[in-house]
Regions:
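A composition-driven surface/loop motif
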Residues: 1-240
Length: 240
């Protein structure tokens, strides 16, 4: 089974009810195409996932509602990847962005069951324009948010509040012996742009990092907490 709740096409959740999902053998929720949570949704509770809690091709978009992902998730909490053709090439389609887009709602994630797990993991961009996030990255090598591309954070659709606790230490998995990476609050392989938001990143784990950006980091807004931004060029204009 690919997931407890699985669709070959896109998956949209709406309505005022609560959805409880337990993925005993693989992902809890998965779709080959995009996954979208409408504003009307009350709550999605991932009670267990043997792999990712939420896994989607094309992109993931959260417009509202509450998403709770517990510590029993074995891999990533929310992962978006590109949809590939039969030759493993990225399908050229405007919807095939590999992105995670959050416009509102509440996302609560605890990463403590597996090393090298991520709260939000996108092959494309992570774009946040509203919402409340609380992510506890407790396992070794875990990351609160990680993108292979760029991350943009603002408050264009709703108030944005992000709190990430990076309490884990180095990943000790055998396959990562050559690169025993640290626990991090945020890891951005491209550029990070923060236009407006309240962000608190606490890197209290041994050698844990707050925010790591390989590209250029541009900040306009309010950033709170203890953390470091490294491996990038930093332009910071912080208004108190």
């Amino acid at each position: 089974h690919k997931a407890c709740l699985y669709t070959k096409g896109h998956l949209e959740l709406s309505g005022e009810g609560t959805l409880n999902v337990t993925g005993n053998s693989n992902h809890a929720i998965a779709s080959k195409e995009y996954f979208q949570v409408k504003r009307s949704v009350k709550a999605i509770n991932i009670l267990k996932a043997a792999n990712d809690a939420i896994h989607a091709g094309q992109y993931i978009q959260v417009n509202g509602g509450e998403i709770n992902i517990t510590s029993t998730t074995t891999n990533d909490a929310m992962q978006a990847e590109y949809k590939l053709d039969d030759n493993n090439a990225i399908i050229q389609d405007p919807e095939n962005t590999g992105s995670i887009i959050v416009k509102g709602g509440t996302i609560n994630i605890e990463l403590s069951n597996s090393q090298d797990s991520k709260g939000l993991k996108a092959e494309g961009d992570i774009i946040i324009s509203g919402g409340s996030f609380k992510i506890d990255a407790l396992s070794n090598g875990s990351r609160g948010m990680q993108t292979d591309a760029n991350m943009v954070i603002n408050q264009n659709d709703a108030t944005t509040s992000i709190t990430i606790n990076a309490k884990g230490t180095k990943c000790t998995l055998a396959e990562d012996a050559a690169d025993p990476h640290n626990c991090m609050g945020m890891k951005v392989d491209g550029n990070l742009t923060i236009n407006d938001a309240t962000i608190k990143v606490y890197n209290t784990g041994k050698k844990a990092k707050g925010i790591k950006v390989k590209g250029t980091c541009t900040i306009n807004g309010v950033v709170k907490g203890s953390g470091t931004i490294n491996e990038g060029n930093i332009t910071a204009t912080i208004d108190n």
